[in-house]
Regions:
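Structural signal for interior beta-strand "rungs" in well-ordered beta-sheet cores
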Residues: 29-133
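Conserved alpha/beta core of the MobA/IspD/sugar-nucleotide pyrophosphorylase nucleotidyltransferase superfamily
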Residues: 1-45
């Protein structure tokens, strides 16, 4: 059993490694996988690159050929193919194909980025649809 916080931490490392190895065997590229937290059951497409210190949580789907940059957090969101997210926080949002986000941006609940939209540095979007302008 687990009786101390140290033992809990060691067990979490073991589980994180097992989960991350499963994603890598299915074609996801994890840079420094020991720093990446992905909850079990999240769908991630082939050839998506996930950099260091990323957390992917909840009811999240990430498409193929994406880049999830270091220090990003994605929760309960839908990310289409060919999306680039750099050091940003995405929560309960939709990002369509070919869009790019950040660095240092935040998509809050009900943010929806249409295809090929660019959201730059330090931008926050909530409850809005952003399309070609």
């Amino acid at each position: 059993g687990i009786n101390t916080k140290i033992q809990l931490s060691e067990e979490e490392k073991i589980m994180r490694r097992r989960i991350n190895e499963e994603y890598m065997l299915n074609g996801v590229i994890l840079e420094n996988p020991e720093t990446i937290t992905i909850q079990k059951g999240i769908r991630i497409g082939r050839d998506t690159v996930i950099e260091s210190n990323v957390k992917i949580l909840g009811d999240t789907i990430i498409g193929e050929n994406c880049l999830i940059g270091m220090n990003s957090r994605i929760e309960d969101s839908k990310i289409a193919d060919d999306v680039k997210i750099l050091s940003s926080v995405i929560e309960k949002a939709i990002v369509e194909k070919g869009a790019d986000v950040g660095p240092f941006s935040r998509l809050r609940p009900k943010a929806h980025l249409k295809e090929r939209v660019h959201i730059g540095n330090f931008v926050e979007v909530k409850n809005a649809v952003v399309g070609e302008g």
